[in-house]
């Protein structure tokens, strides 16, 4: 395994099997994206109220959302990157709303597991620096997440 993933399930609604699939899926994505071995990621499964508060406090949007990610290795303006080959990178945290994932799975007509996988990959790509603020960025990121999910076998 490339990634060290720390799961926290505040909802007690995600099974060990589902966490194992997410772990395998993100390790597959990490391999495709050439992520260094030992990289660390935190994944929290929360309810809508918890993600609403996070979304309000960090993004200024007072409403629940499906996934939020916080990259830890991002450099701010004027910051210098400190590289140490012996320290595995701390990629950051992915926070997923379980009620939103269930709602969206039903809305899009696919399984809860597929939606959970989609949200995990989406958050993971954000940790790696991908974004969708412009049309071009969106095209690249969404194509990448679709490719990862399809190649892994987690299709709609």
UniProtKB/Swiss-Prot annotation:
GO terms for cellular component: cytoplasm. It is found in: Cytoplasm. It is an enzyme of class 3 (hydrolase). The keyword Ribosomal protein does not apply. The keyword Transport does not apply. It holds the Pfam family YbeY. HAMAP family: Endoribonucl_YbeY (MF_00009). Single strand-specific metallo-endoribonuclease involved in late-stage 70S ribosome quality control and in maturation of the 3' terminus of the 16S rRNA. NCBIfam families: rRNA maturation RNase YbeY (TIGR00043). This is Endoribonuclease YbeY. It comes from Geobacillus sp. (strain WCH70). The lineage of its organism: Bacteria, Bacillati, Bacillota, Bacilli, Bacillales.
């Amino acid at each position: 395994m490339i990634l060290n993933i720390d799961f926290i399930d505040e909802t007690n609604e995600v099974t060990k099997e589902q966490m194992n699939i997410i772990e395998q899926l993100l390790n597959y994505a990490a391999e495709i994206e050439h992520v260094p071995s030992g990289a660390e990621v935190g994944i929290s499964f929360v309810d809508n109220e918890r993600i609403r508060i996070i979304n309000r406090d960090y993004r200024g949007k007072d409403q629940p959302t499906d996934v939020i990610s916080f990259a830890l290795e991002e450099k701010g303006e004027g910051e210098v990157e400190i590289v140490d080959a012996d320290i595995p990178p701390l990629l950051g945290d992915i926070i997923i709303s379980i009620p939103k994932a269930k709602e969206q799975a039903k809305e899009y007509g696919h399984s809860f597991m597929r939606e959970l996988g989609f949200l995990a990959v989406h958050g993971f790509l954000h940790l790696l620096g991908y974004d969708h603020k412009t049309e071009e960025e969106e095209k690249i990121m969404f194509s990448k997440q679709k490719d990862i999910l399809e190649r892994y076998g987690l299709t709609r």
